[in-house]
Amino acid sequence: MRKINFSAGPSTLPLEILEQAQKELCDYQGRGYSIMEISHRTKVFEEVHFGAQEKAKKLYGLNDDYEVLFLQGGASLQFAMIPMNLSLNGVCEYANTGVWTKKAIKEAQILGVNVKTVASSEESNFNHIPRVEFSDNADYAYICSNNTIYGTQYQNYPKTKAPLIVDASSDFFSRKVDFSNIALFYGGVQKNAGISGLSCIFIRKDMLERSKNKQIPSMLNYLTHAENQSLFNTPPTFAIYMFNLEMDWLLNQGELDKVHEKNSQKAAMLYECIDLSNGFYKGHADKKDRSLMNVSFNIAKNKDLEPLFVKEAEEAGMIGLKGHRILGGIRASIYNALNLDQVKTLCEFMKEFQGKYA
């Protein structure tokens, strides 16, 4: 019997995708070989590769103004590649909403970029999204869409004349996005759209001009990968294959509005369970900034019960509920692949646990 996986990433995958990958693992589409065994230069793999890119653009409703790049190194490599490629001679502005923005800021500073933190919620342990106003003339404005550890999420992205950079690693393909002022939108795909080893970057083509005359190693230059259709070097072929299956699965769910609707229902159920617990459970994030993807909470009346909660949840068939080591507590990551019944099972367990130990 499969466990219900609330892990923050790598995370649960739709069973249909796992079964299809299992079916095709040794014999891809009856060809007598695995997709993992063939060259990335073959027509067979290129159909998967380019098909995945087109499906990703289709889900977000993007036209040819955007390039889709498949890169390695995780979202963490983008913390360096973004300032390396996109900084000019001005100021690069960041909104600091958690560990991942702090790391992005640090990488930019290491590169000697003029970095300005224009807003931060660190003083309250990142429990909310701060009000942010970016300068119109900044080289770029940087945010993290969803903060996996703390369970906060931008409900709407800031409006800015500066090119907006969005780390969407933990809410990738979970809702529709207005790309009207987004210059670069990226994430590792291992939470909501595949397995680890692949990052997907949507970059507006005019931004590639910024890399043109810079002395950047080829592998770290966005232009290199755009000009070579993300095939400059051997890509993570199996991760791209899995991403392609995820794109098919998401398209079969309907538009991202439909995906968002399901995610909203799951989150509402879980937050209601917390809010109606008479203070037994307490969420970390301010209600107005609550994430639909990561629900971080404590057993407020007795934090010593939290390890027992995780243990008993595992015995009941639910894994991945231990909070991040930085924040502690409990965290339920309820990404696209989790269904409403699975979240309902967690809520029922939470009520039973409260009944036993309150």
Swiss-Prot record:
Its EC number is 2.6.1.52. It is an enzyme of class 2 (transferase). Keywords: Amino-acid biosynthesis, Aminotransferase, Cytoplasm, Pyridoxal phosphate, Pyridoxine biosynthesis, Serine biosynthesis, Transferase. The modification N6-(pyridoxal phosphate)lysine is found at K191. Its main location: cytoplasm. Pathway: Amino-acid biosynthesis; L-serine biosynthesis; L-serine from 3-phospho-D-glycerate: step 2/3; Cofactor biosynthesis; pyridoxine 5'-phosphate biosynthesis; pyridoxine 5'-phosphate from D-erythrose 4-phosphate: step 3/5. Catalyzes the reversible conversion of 3-phosphohydroxypyruvate to phosphoserine and of 3-hydroxy-2-oxo-4-phosphonooxybutanoate to phosphohydroxythreonine. Homodimer. This is Phosphoserine aminotransferase. The lineage of its organism: Bacteria, Pseudomonadati, Campylobacterota, Epsilonproteobacteria, Campylobacterales.
